[in-house]
From Swiss-Prot:
Main location: cytoplasm
Compartment(s) of residence: Cytoplasm
NCBIfam families xrefs: bioA, PRK05964.1, PRK07986.1
Highest taxon of the lineage: Bacteria
Protein name in UniProt: Adenosylmethionine-8-amino-7-oxononanoate aminotransferase
Organism (species): Buchnera aphidicola subsp. Baizongia pistaciae (strain Bp)
Binding, substrate: 52, 144, 274, 307, 391
Pfam families in the record: Aminotran_3
Protein's job: Catalyzes the transfer of the alpha-amino group from S-adenosyl-L-methionine (SAM) to 7-keto-8-aminopelargonic acid (KAPA) to form 7,8-diaminopelargonic acid (DAPA). It is the only aminotransferase known to utilize SAM as an amino donor.
Amino acid sequence: MQKNNLNFDKQHIWHPYASMIQPTPCILVKSAKGIILKLHNGKKLIDGMSSWWSTIHGYNHPRLNNALKNQINKMSHVMFGGITHYPAISLCKKLIEITPNSLTRIFLSDSGSVSIEIAIKMILQYWQSLGKNKVIFLTIKKSYHGDTFAAMSVCDPKNSFHQFYHNFLPINIFADNPKCSFDGLWNKKDIISFKKLIQKHKDVVAAVILEPIVQSVGGMKFYHPNYLKQVRFLCDLYKIPLILDEIATGFGRTGKFFAFEHSNIVPDVLCIGKAITGGTITLSATLTTDKIANVISNSASGCLMHGPTFMGNPLACAAAYENILILQENKWKIQVKNIETCLRTYLFPLKTHYEVYDVRVLGAIGVVECYHYINISMMQNYFVKNNVWIRPFRKLIYLVPAYIIDNASLKKLINVISNALNYENFFMK
């Protein structure tokens, strides 16, 4: 039965970034609890990925489950056009409470990429409403903002997953990505490329969009907080809105509730997702200011031209509200600090390994960057055989575990990574 189902999956189901001819092997998960994935064959894996940054409290958290159960008995979904409900109202009150005071208007949607689409449409409508032809977005190389169309246009056109669509995407502007590391020395030369481009194109740039502090899929790099401060200063100088993509970093992952807090700045538009529901169900939000919302609302259209079918889904809103209540108990601060300490203690020594180019740690993120591209199938199989779930990509082996992970489990993940580095055939040389 298990083999038949896996064969069906292999032949018919298209997984993320996977070939249908030679797909990376999938494992069959039966259930998940805490930091453990239980497979149908009885094997248990320690999860080091928190399902792509999302399940920050672990799987099957009783409070999140209860929030979903209580809501599903009332209504699982209702359209959001002309209708509202308490789960959405309660969640949005919380979002306004935990974000900067200037972010007062919230557009709910169903995935991180869509929240970026909405942010881009929001800004385009803003300038159109003011009668200005500003349609270009400025960002930095090695950026990643999602896989939908407008989101792809602000991802690095040469070093992202989206170079195949280059001829079809809107053409935006990319400054050099910052080189000064998060905890390194600041060099004001780091901002020169960005400064030149924003000065040159200030009359056509609609907005700047960045991942604050952490460039995720673009290489898992952590850049200096002063870079973001300088970007904010230049945006203010030229009256250009700043969009910050906190989809991966929001809700405590970097040691701050939002990564932009490391730089003590505030965006004009904020995109959040992934961990917003504790990884239970998909949801995202795009937050903006009174100024931007009022300009759009007073325009000829009178509204933001977007409306997803599952916008404001009550189940997702209920889970997100409970997730924020859990976070507001502030255990996450101690948990993330403990993870960071453990990663620095046990992951940093891998810097001396001959296969390792660099090791980076920030909050509950640990990254081993190798010299060579990784054979993902072989290394992934090795991880599963050794009872851990880690999903490498390109030259990177990284950990973004649930905040509840214990030191012993985290050490186990690191130890398996350390051993995997010794297998020459895991690397494409």
